[in-house]
Regions:
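Extended, small-residue-rich solenoid/repeat segments and analogous flexible loops
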Residues: 21-45, 49-50
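Extracellular/mature segments of secreted proteins
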Residues: 32-39, 59, 136-140
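Extracellular beta-strand/beta-solenoid scaffold signature
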Residues: 76-78, 98-99
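Glycine-centered beta-turn/loop sites at beta-strand termini
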Residues: 32-33, 42, 51-53, 61-64, ...
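Extracellular, beta-strand-rich repeat scaffolds characterized by small/acidic residue-biased motifs
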Residues: 44-46, 53-55, 64-66, 73-76, ...
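Secretory targeting and sorting signals
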Residues: 1-24
């Protein structure tokens, strides 16, 4: 009986672990350095951050300074791009997926996206936001 319980535990344990979702790693360039992470973070100063698509749940944060953030593809559901403080330029060439967010945050920002199925929010300051279609941006003055 002990062997049967042990064998059953070995069979059930991997199945239980496989049910836990994992985030895919996003590959970006931050100021010319390759970063592979689910949470890509810039510096307190001005940054140039370029990425392909963001996997569901992944995040890119510019932090302070006048950041240039370019996502060449789409944002998966729940992915977040944060400009941070400073006058940021944030562009998402593809679709902003459901539950995904593009946040300009503090100061005046320029945000441009493809179709917005999530949320585009300019934040505080005078923000210029352009979305190709879908949900309209909020907290954008122009």
């Amino acid at each position: 009986m002990t062997r049967a319980l042990c064998a059953a535990t070995l069979v059930i344990a991997p199945v239980a672990l496989a049910a836990t979702p994992a985030h895919a790693v996003t590959t970006c360039q931050v100021n010319g350095v390759t970063v592979n992470s689910t949470n890509v973070v810039g510096t307190a100063g001005s940054d140039r951050i370029t990425c392909g698509s963001l996997a569901p749940g992944d995040q890119v944060s510019g932090l302070g300074g006048a950041d240039y953030i370019l996502i060449g593809g789409s944002l998966g559901g729940g992915a977040v791009v944060r400009g941070g403080s400073g006058q940021d330029y944030v562009q998402v060439n593809g679709t902003v997926g459901p539950m995904a967010q593009v946040l300009g945050e503090a100061d005046g920002d320029f945000i441009r996206t493809g179709t917005n199925l999530g949320a585009v929010n300019g934040g505080t300051g005078f923000d210029l936001c352009r979305v190709a279609g879908g949900n309209p941006p909020v907290n954008c003055e122009a």
